A protein has these predicted regions:
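Extended, non-catalytic substrate-recognition/exosite surfaces adjacent to catalytic cores, especially
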Residues: 1-31
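Soluble, non-transmembrane domains of envelope/secretory-pathway proteins that act on or interact
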Residues: 2-11, 42-44, 48-173
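Active-site core of glycosidic bond-cleaving carbohydrate-active enzymes
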Residues: 17-18, 22, 30, 34, ...
């Protein structure tokens, strides 16, 4: 085809690595137990990964965009006519994620991929670096306040200056 117009994105580096880490952690939860959880329990992909499922209201489009510390991959399933639906049960998690899972398994099985004429070696044990300024805190699973010894516990990560400071009152006694 013929290039009609080339767009050069206006990009800039995000300076706060800790905020980026928190956003990534939220996207990891999509894969570790949210709408993209089947990547783990059904498709058995256990390398560190994060992602986002998506479905349009009319179910004409479904997608899954996922990434590891070494690779980003997006899958879109859709029809270029928005009046046509993919079907009642066709969500990002059911239509696009299976294609993502099969593809990323094959890429990791191959052990490398080519990018800008260079070979990138893959390692499913490579994880994201946790920058300074991120802390892990035990919180009450019910109130989300700082946990007391009698609280049902969850562990969450926070920006150091924004961690919960109030102790749970519901389980204080």
């Amino acid at each position: 085809g013929q290039v009609i117009k080339e767009f050069i994105p206006d990009s800039r580096e995000i300076k706060d690595e800790a905020v980026v880490y928190l956003l990534r952690d939220m996207m990891r939860s999509v894969v570790d137990g949210g709408t993209g959880g089947s990547l783990r329990w059904k498709y058995k992909f256990y390398a560190p990964a994060a992602g986002k499922t998506g479905t349009t209201n009319s179910k004409a489009d479904a997608w899954f965009v996922g990434y590891t510390p070494q690779l980003t991959l997006g899958v879109w399933v859709g029809i270029d006519d928005p009046s046509v639906s993919l079907g009642e049960k066709q969500y990002g998690s059911s239509a696009a994620l299976p294609i993502f899972a099969e593809t990323i398994h094959e890429i990791y099985k191959n052990g490398s991929y080519s990018y800008l004429n260079e070979s990138v070696q893959l390692d499913n044990k490579v994880n994201w670096y946790r920058p300074p300024g991120i802390i892990e805190v035990e919180i009450c699973a019910e109130t989300y306040d700082k946990a007391t010894p009698t609280c049902p516990l969850n562990r969450e990560i926070y920006l150091k200056d924004y961690r919960p400071r109030e102790s749970c009152q519901k389980h204080a006694n």
